[in-house]
Each structure stands twice: as C-alpha cells, then as structure tokens.
Amino acid sequence: MSLNRSEKEAVISDVTGLAAKAQTLVMAEYRGITVADMTKLRSTARSNGVSLSVLKNTLARRAVTGSGFEIVSDLMTGPLIYGFSEDAVAAARVVADFAKTNVKLVIRGGAYGGKALDVNGVKQLASIPSKEVLLAQLLGLMQSPISRTARVLAAIAEKKGAGVADAPVEAAAEAVAA
C-alpha cells in the first residue's frame, strides 16, 4: 500500500517525535516472522514502554535526520522493525530477548547516546539491569557497611552484657533456691 505525501509527512512527524523523546533505537530484520510472533513482540514491547514500528526505510532515514540516531541511517536497509525507547535499555532488552527465542528476528544494530551500536553492542546494552535494579543494588551497597557495623556493635554489646546480665539472674536463682 502506497502512502500519499501527507500520510508520509505524518509518519515522518510521528517518528521524529519518537526519536526526540527516545534514548535508544534498535533495528532488527523481521523477515519470515509469523504474525502471531510479531503480535507477541509488539505486546511485550508495549508493556515495556518500547515503541515498535515497521517503517519504510526512506521515511525512517528522513525522520531521524538531525537526531542522535542519524549515525545509523546507513544500516536502514531491508525489512526492518524499529524500536524506540525512553528507557536506555528497554528496546535493546525486548528485541534481544525475543531474538533469543525466535531465530528469524535478526538484530542489525542500533544507537544509544549518539553512538552507533553493532549487534554485540545491542546485546551488551540489553544485558544491563534496569535503572530500578541498579538503584536497588547501589542502595544495598551503601547500606551494607552500616548494617555490618550495627551487627558487630550488637555482638560486642551482647558479649559484654552477657556476663553482667547473667549475674543478677544467677543471684536471684540462688536466693530462691536457698
């Protein structure tokens, strides 16, 4: 189905808006994927805040012109699905996880932070934990020395207090027995 000029301009404007908000772009070749698998991929992407689009490559190139994703415009050939996400790792994770279970989805590359990513770069980006997990790990690291110190102090207090606290109990037990 061919698009007229106004429809093409609308698509370019929509994708330009996505690119302006997004931190990451991932591109994958989807040749041979069934409709059911593509529907699952789209559903997973939506639930993770990733916008997946099948676009004409010329429209995609025009849409990313002037953005940080322009550096990968030379990779925009063949039947591609484009994943944009505001979260730095979400698009890479969704596409890489799906590609593990469906060999027909082939990651072509992507862009993050104004830099082009090859296939391995996208996979490395996908392996990074989410922001929430990283913050939880950081908080755990910060709390670890404090909780360790508290446990040591409690053990010292228990050790010193054990002899003092047991003496009145023993004296009371002897008084009751006598």
Curated annotation (Swiss-Prot):
It comes from the Bacteria. The keyword Aminoacyl-tRNA synthetase does not apply. GO terms for molecular function: large ribosomal subunit rRNA binding; structural constituent of ribosome. One of its GO terms (cellular component) is large ribosomal subunit. One of its GO terms (biological process) is translation. InterPro entries: Ribosomal_uL10, Ribosomal_uL10-like_sf, Ribosomal_uL10_bac, Ribosomal_uL10_bac_type, Ribosomal_uL10_CS_bac. Keywords: Ribonucleoprotein, Ribosomal protein, RNA-binding, rRNA-binding. The keyword rRNA-binding applies. SUPFAM superfamilies: Ribosomal protein L10-like. CDD domains: Ribosomal_L10 (cd05797). Belongs to the universal ribosomal protein uL10 family. Part of the ribosomal stalk of the 50S ribosomal subunit. The N-terminus interacts with L11 and the large rRNA to form the base of the stalk. The C-terminus forms an elongated spine to which L12 dimers bind in a sequential fashion forming a multimeric L10(L12)X complex. HAMAP family: Ribosomal_uL10 (MF_00362). Forms part of the ribosomal stalk, playing a central role in the interaction of the ribosome with GTP-bound translation factors. This is Large ribosomal subunit protein uL10. The lineage of its organism: Bacteria, Pseudomonadati, Pseudomonadota, Betaproteobacteria, Burkholderiales. The gene is rplJ.
